[in-house]
């Protein structure tokens, strides 16, 4: 009688599936505005004056995965500062947001910032300042609130 490879394949398959399921992360739940206001280093409102994006290898997802993220560099003209020091009305402020671009195999996980504003949108952003990289990052996933299209001024 020849030994069968099927039991070994089944064990390998179940083990691989269990490992992937154990290491899979879930989407991040939206935070209430009160919690973001309390935890943020800066909270500002402004008009989006520039938005640039690029796709790069993911810093969020790792492992047996082909993962690319779309990184957005968003520049605001600050119209109001609700919290934080070092930013004044009228100052330009650049922040970084991201969304997944490619995931193979498709797995659940963080979905980045939702929504990402368009050029000209009025937004309120709840930010965390990273001292090391000197960059601002909105809370994930809902640290960017679109207040509306730009207001017309006379």
Language-model features and meaning:
Residues 2-12:
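Bacterial N-terminal signal peptides that target proteins for export
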Residues 11-21:
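Bacterial N-terminal signal peptides
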Residues 4, 19-154:
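Transition segments tied to proteolytic processing and entry into folded domains
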